[in-house]
Design a protein with these regions (language model features):
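Conserved ABC ATPase signature
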Residues: 46-49, 263-321, 329, 335-339
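Conserved catalytic network of the ASCE P-loop NTPase/AAA+ motor domain
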Residues: 41-42, 93-95, 105-108, 321-324, ...
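Conserved Walker B
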Residues: 10, 334-339, 368
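Conserved P-loop NTP-binding catalytic core
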Residues: 34-48, 52, 61-122
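Electropositive, glycine-dotted interaction segments
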Residues: 112-258
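Short alpha-helix of the ABC ATPase nucleotide-binding domain corresponding to the H-loop/switch region
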Residues: 340-345
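C-terminal lobe/lid and adjacent interdomain/linker elements of RecA-like ASCE P-loop ATPase modules
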Residues: 1-4, 346-432
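Pre-Walker A-like glycine/lysine-rich segment at the N-terminus of P-loop NTPase domains
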Residues: 2-66, 432
């Protein structure tokens, strides 16, 4: 589980901003909201981020995705850039280093992984573990300007032999993290394996409002041999009053014609996929069929006839299945996209009531109705706000001094929590 994430000098973020899943001493629904990662240490399972347009909500999720990506993937060549921009709205930030640091827990041990970089290279990287009250270094790297290379050193507790250490150090180019280089090595099992596995399968890609979740649903139905996930999805749809009684996946194949072969060869898809399609000589088609109860019986509708809201909630139900059955961290941007507020609230309640593991959800949203709900703890709510210089500031509701008797929804509407977007006159000068 993630305890804390710090970001500095990344897109709209200039000064160091910290997102924390450490709870306050609020007693509200502790058993639903908190998970014990070690004796005496509990972390929040959920985070909700509000903010006006262009205030930096998505930047926060992008920073997490960037951090995960740099820990997993080695650049194609050593001359590739880091793939980001620093804060650009002043004369000095673009010349300074950026930094990120994540504190997280695995197997009841606390890890701290930090990174300092710019657009061209990584300057510092360190991974520490707390097996006691004192930190132990697993590895560190530093950039040597004189020789233009990164020096990597491993701690005695890393569990990695000297030969593997040399191989990892040799693969750690200036634009590649030690973790990504480790992922390319044939190393024996160590604590680094657990860290790499967390970034690979524990943290998931951000779900954006542009993502079609229908592909996820089809993939789950295709591999659902015992219909467990299908029953879960139908249970969700029934409870949400969608009038859908069954789901099925209609699959078919079509032979590739010479004209289709030309289209495939020029299509923006991976070469491996093109080769496999042409080798097979057929294209696979699949479509979800929805069975509804109507006047006089059961009726089947093709997926293209279902609403965007139905598809989105079905996809969100797949997400819910995963966080309930696997220990995942899943970021969701604009979680309210295409679904009614009551369904959004129901989704959150379902997660809180049924989550027994260490899964976490981090959601951004524009829907302020959640601020009016009694079941939402104040320490899970965050706001992104812009300074006069255009820099994103991350503020926690529980730290804003709002009296416990005051409704956060009304305080937000009155501009007592963060600045609301300034809207000009509704009358336009039509002569311009």
């Amino acid at each position: 589980m993630i305890q804390e994430f710090q970001i500095q000098n990344f897109f709209s973020i200039r000064e160091r901003q910290t997102l924390s899943f450490l709870p306050t001493n609020d007693d509200k629904m502790r058993s639903q909201y908190l998970y014990e990662v070690a004796e005496g240490v509990e972390l929040l399972k959920i985070g909700i981020v509000y903010g006006s347009n262009a205030s930096g909500k998505t930047t926060l999720l992008d920073a997490l995705a960037f951090f995960r990506r740099t820990m997993l993937y080695k650049p194609e060549n050593k001359n590739m850039g880091m793939g980001y921009v620093p804060f650009l709205l002043d004369n000095h930030s673009r010349k300074e280093h950026s930094s990120m640091q994540m504190t997280f827990w695995l197997n009841r041990e606390k890890y701290i992984l930090s990174l300092e970089f710019d657009e061209k290279r990584i300057y510092e990287e360190m991974l520490m573990v707390y097996t006691s009250s004192r930190p132990t270094k697993l590895y560190s790297r530093s950039y040597q300007q004189e020789t233009d290379h990164s020096e990597v050193t491993f701690g005695s507790k890393s569990g990695i032999n000297k030969a593997t250490q040399r191989a990892i150090a040799g693969n750690t180019t200036n634009n590649c993290t030690v973790m990504a280089a480790f992922g390319q090595s044939n190393a024996a099992t160590s604590r680094l394996n657990a860290v790499a596995e967390y970034f690979y399968s524990g943290m998931r890609d951000t779900l954006s409002p542009r993502d079609s979740l229908t592909f996820n649903v089809k993939d789950e139905l295709r591999h659902d041999k015992e219909d467990k996930k299908k029953r879960f999805l139908l249970q969700m749809l029934k409870a949400s009053d969608f009038n859908i009684t069954d789901l099925s996946l209609d699959e078919s194949e079509e032979s590739i014609t010479p004209e289709m072969e030309k289209t495939i060869k020029s299509a923006p898809i991976p070469e491996e996929a093109k080769v496999e399609m042409l080798r097979r000589g057929t294209l696979k088609h699949d479509e979800i069929l929805f069975q509804h109860t109507g006047d006089g019986g059961e009726y089947t509708l093709h997926e293209r006839l279902e609403s965007a809201g139905t598809h989105r909630f079905l996809g969100m139900s797949v997400v819910l299945y995963y966080v309930l059955h696997h220990n995942n961290f899943i970021p969701i941007d604009e979680v309210e996209t295409s679904i009614h507020y009551e369904l959004l609230s129901y989704f959150i309640k379902l997660f809180l009531a049924n989550s027994e593991g260490s899964s976490q959800l981090l959601m951004t949203t524009h829907d302020i109705n959640l601020l009016n709900e009694d079941y939402i703890r104040r320490d899970v709510v965050w706001f992104t706000d812009k300074s006069r210089e255009g820099a994103t500031q991350l503020k926690r509701l529980s730290s804003l001094g709002l009296h416990k008797t005051m409704n956060p929804y009304h305080a937000y509407k009155q501009g007592k929590l963060v600045d609301l977007p300034f809207l000009g006159s509704i009358y336009l000068d039509k002569e311009d």
